[in-house]
């Protein structure tokens, strides 16, 4: 009897036949990558932290308890050191946070014992508290100066139409004029008025009735734009013109802009009958260097 060993049906070339060793190779389970193979792959297991945690925040070193970092559950620090996220360490084994650490000590002091920073550091610490999402610290800081006063100031400015736009316009005009004239400073005329129209008639107070009783056509006669670069107003609040001027100067100064201002008169445009526009006009001097 002759036993014939042939190729699989449909196979035309002996070289195409698959050996048993080839089949085993094809169905092998993928190997678990080693640390070398994984390169920079992060650990899959939850990260374990010691009870006392050494920190490197932007190059500044701190040490605190793990419970301090986890004091408030809904904060970035609590999430970072919950074990759910991988925190890299520096060469000395300190857990690294890529953030300027100048005010991190104030953050830790609040987490430890509820201490608030001195007044001169309230603003920058508030910014750090926003970054780390520490709600209780934000609430406390908003109730102390200068942030409490700033909250009131912003409530007033919220009544001011186009305040930020007008502020930007002052800067742009001053910059353009200084560049065009190759000058160190630039001057602008700014009108600041609280009421929609100055209603005191020029040297004729008995005409005050026009303030309340005037037709639509008469009202249009009262509508005009003073010949100035920027106008602020009107608004409805107790704060007066000088309060708004203080806001303008403060906000420009906070942006590093040197500004001086003085009242140079009033708009004297004739409106109707004995009425003249008496909006105050201020000269703003912006010094660039």
UniProtKB/Swiss-Prot annotation:
Statement: the UniProt record of this protein carries the keyword Membrane: yes
Protein name as catalogued: BTB/POZ domain-containing protein KCTD7
Feature: compositional bias, Polar residues: 1-10
Bridged cysteine pairs (disulfide): none
Domain annotation BTB: ranges: 51-149
InterPro entries per record: BTB/POZ_dom, SKP1/BTB/POZ_sf, T1-type_BTB
Function: May be involved in the control of excitability of cortical neurons.
Chain spans, region Disordered: 1-35
Alphabetic keyword roster: Cell membrane, Cytoplasm, Membrane
